[in-house]
């Protein structure tokens, strides 16, 4: 009989997911959403269940996956904020420092890095802990298998979680489903190539059609999502390389993927980073 169950909390901002993995008494939240308000809603779901929140596990250092961590921690002071590696912790600190410098944390000031200038900010170095292994065990029973040895892909460093009890792979942002993928600032061409290779590796490892694939953005799927993501990334590179302007590249991706969410942010920033307009500026 399965010990663990998984619930998806679908965030509205960025179409990002948080997941609650729980047994009868304890829970782990995987990723904490993009804003304080939605994280507070997530906290209420956990509180209403009557379970103890054991940990907030952040899969990688992009803000839509960790901005809500302080809100959850304040709701559940005994919960640990965990990452899989020192590299992911460093990514989180560095990204937050950069976001503060360009004003991207002005709407979420509680997550500005703590400093003399922002004494009420978040103490990333002190509050985020490194798991220190490849297994996270829930109090009350149930193991999560953590992997973080991926090369740079959608993020510089990334962790996935496999839940054997549920035959479920939580891919974080290695997969998106019905949502345009982030290939913007920081995602180099070589990282996209790595990403395609990693998806091939995951397809081979999780070939069982009964495996549930939980993406970082969008609805649950199955192992066919790995190939669909590879095609999407190939189409994206073909669009930004094959069109004369960013507008044309955007239009091509919209035609290929009608109904996909995040055209105005994730796709737009990705095209702006890789597209013909950026190449023209570099050549000038």
Language-model features: where?
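Short acidic-hydrophobic surface loop/beta-edge motif
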Residues: 9, 21, 133-139
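Metallo-beta-lactamase
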Residues: 34, 143, 148-228, 235
